[in-house]
Amino acid sequence: MKQNLLLSLVAFLLCGALIVQAQEPAKSVAGPTTTAAGAAVISITANSTPLDLARAAFTAQGGEKFRNVRNMMLRGSVDLYQPNSVQSIPGGFSIVTAGDKLRMDIDARPIVVFKQIYDGQQSYSSLPNVELPPITKFGLSLLIKFDQPGYKVTAIPDKKRQRGFRIADAEGNTTDFYIDATTGRVMSFLIYYAGYTFGTDMKKFKEIDGVLVPSSFSQRFEMPQGAFFADYNVKEVKLNQTLPEDAFAIPN
């Protein structure tokens, strides 16, 4: 695989981490909460405002339990599709997050074996020239902060049976969310980073300790030479574990 295409693929794979919520210290403002994703009461009507939709999505994810996840570990398989190819490249992945810290490992030999670590201050990549999108500023991590000062929730067009809303922070980092009009679950989202658009579609979910976690999802990354696709299947989920001290250690 050509180097530029490989780097694009790796950058795309890093966005798989955006389905994992990464928590920064923050306090929520007054609003409905829930004790478990399965017990959440979701009310979405034709008159629901963008803020109502964001609150419904937050509640469906598990409410305050979703917000207060200390760390999350996902492991599973991934099938990669290069632009203009119907042949998949099978591999495995592991994602660990805690706050704004991240460790992601991808093994899709012989095409790519990759490790990315961010320890909260500095980052490490096993491949040069790969930039990590800040996971606390996009995706489900942004949904956690929908009601925080400095975050703006606005309307976007709905699509099919899904209601849409946009969350942006003070720096302009933006994610567009589309939620099920009945359950409030986030079914897809789009992020905009470094001039590119990354799309994620949720297929299946698991409820773990009152938190809704995607167990199967796909991603799409548009490039001038075509689109990358990746299908992820999560086989193991762990929340709020005691992590080893070197979980996010930067290699010497």
Provide a role label for each language-model segment:
Residues 1-9:
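Bacterial N-terminal signal peptides that target proteins for export
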Residues 8-17:
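Bacterial N-terminal signal peptides
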Residues 20-22:
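Boundary at the C-terminal end of the N-terminal hydrophobic targeting segment
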Residues 24-36:
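N-terminal propeptides/low-complexity segments immediately following signal peptides
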Residues 38-46, 50-129:
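N-terminal mature ectodomain segment of secretory-pathway/periplasmic proteins
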Residues 120-148:
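Acidic/charged, solvent-exposed loop-and-adjacent secondary-structure segments enriched in E/D, K/R, S/T
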Residues 144-156, 194-200:
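A short, amphipathic edge element
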Residues 161-251:
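Gly/Pro-enriched, hydrophobic low-complexity segments
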